[in-house]
């Protein structure tokens, strides 16, 4: 499958480096997620006043909304070092033990995709999170013995796109659980303007708003679209991103005014044309459009549900009248 310009996942190492260069250093520079920021400000200040490690934090929500960035900002606000890893990277208990024993007092351990930790790894985390200790088994067979090692106070920040896959015992050990929401058009416009300033790209307010409007409520997509529109401005314009140029560029990139691309439209058209608008099961949809179920659940559904183009029911997915109107298809409600 071709790379999607509106994918909310990072696509390569270059984009990871690009995102790193744009990251804010503190909560005051972090745009959006105001409720989360306000609460974290209080929790961080309280922990600092008590000279304690911040409670463990779980951040969940669709990809591209700034979970990793927020983890970095939390560490910066705490004046702490941060060590980063991911669920798939921790394959054996020894991998986690090595990371935990390398922590210094007050450090932040960030685990992305924490829902992908195995149960064996989770069980090692329980005492580490609750009591700052690590139980390890030395030897094998009848001579094996358990040794408890003390760990320094630390903060675990877990990030996940699928909080429902976390086991209850692990989820319950997080003192702070925050859901990151899609961004508003105004917030994304502010992000586009900030990024354009960092990139030394000329852009007017209407140009920034046009990019924001098509960014699916996701900063990562907004920044990626800005980079591509900037190319059009330099090659086919005078170097300035205007509303007119942004519209032309994004149309050529096949991103419509609501942020849908050809894959989104294919999904909606398939449900409408092949299944009379639904309800239809997700596995059937996936087979019909040649996508994996998990890809649809993580990458397409959240935004289509958010803007009211899709409904999730016990019987399956249904395309809404709003989506019909957007696609220019006559909507006939079944009696």
Swiss-Prot record:
DNA binds at residues 293, 312, 317. Residues 1-183 are annotated as: Large ATPase domain (RuvB-L). One of its GO terms (biological process) is DNA repair. One of its GO terms (cellular component) is Holliday junction resolvase complex. It is found in: Cytoplasm. SMART domains: AAA. HAMAP family: DNA_HJ_migration_RuvB. Homohexamer. Forms an RuvA(8)-RuvB(12)-Holliday junction (HJ) complex. HJ DNA is sandwiched between 2 RuvA tetramers; dsDNA enters through RuvA and exits via RuvB. An RuvB hexamer assembles on each DNA strand where it exits the tetramer. Each RuvB hexamer is contacted by two RuvA subunits (via domain III) on 2 adjacent RuvB subunits; this complex drives branch migration. In the full resolvosome a probable DNA-RuvA(4)-RuvB(12)-RuvC(2) complex forms which resolves the HJ. This is Holliday junction branch migration complex subunit RuvB. It comes from Listeria monocytogenes serovar 1/2a (strain ATCC BAA-679 / EGD-e).
């Amino acid at each position: 499958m071709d790379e999607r310009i509106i994918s909310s996942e990072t696509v390569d190492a270059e984009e990871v480096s690009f995102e790193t260069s744009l990251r804010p250093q503190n909560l005051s520079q972090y745009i959006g997620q105001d409720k989360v920021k306000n609460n974290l400000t209080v929790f961080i200040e309280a922990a600092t006043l008590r000279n304690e490690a911040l409670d463990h934090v779980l951040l969940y929500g669709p990809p591209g909304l700034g979970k990793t960035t927020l983890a970095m900002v939390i560490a910066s606000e705490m004046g702490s070092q941060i060590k980063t890893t991911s669920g798939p990277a921790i394959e054996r208990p020894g991998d986690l033990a090595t990371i935990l024993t390398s922590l210094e007092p007050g450090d932040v351990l960030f685990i992305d995709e924490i829902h992908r930790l195995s149960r064996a790894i989770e069980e090692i985390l329980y005492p580490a999170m609750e009591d700052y200790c690590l139980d390890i088994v030395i030897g094998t067979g009848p001579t094996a013995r358990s040794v408890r090692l003390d760990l320094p106070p630390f903060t675990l920040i877990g990030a996940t796109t699928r909080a429902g896959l976390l086991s209850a015992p692990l989820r319950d050990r997080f003192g702070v659980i925050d859901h990151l929401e899609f961004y508003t058009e105004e917030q994304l416009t502010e992000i586009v303007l900030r990024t354009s300033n960092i990139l030394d790209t000329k852009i007017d307010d209407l140009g920034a708003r046009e990019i924001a409007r098509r960014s699916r409520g996701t900063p990562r997509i907004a920044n990626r679209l800005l980079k591509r529109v900037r190319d059009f401005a330099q090659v086919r314009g005078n170097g300035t991103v205007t509303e007119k140029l942004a519209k032309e560029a994004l149309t050529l990139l096949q991103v419509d005014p609501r942020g849908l691309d050809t894959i989104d439209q294919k999904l909606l058209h398939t449900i409408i044309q092949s299944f009379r608008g639904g309800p239809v099961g997700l596995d059937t949809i996936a087979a019909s459009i040649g996508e994996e179920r998990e890809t649809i659940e993580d990458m397409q559904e959240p935004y289509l549900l958010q803007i009211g183009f899709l409904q999730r029911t016990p019987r399956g997915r249904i395309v809404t009248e709003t989506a019909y109107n957007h696609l220019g298809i006559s909507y006939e409600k079944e009696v």
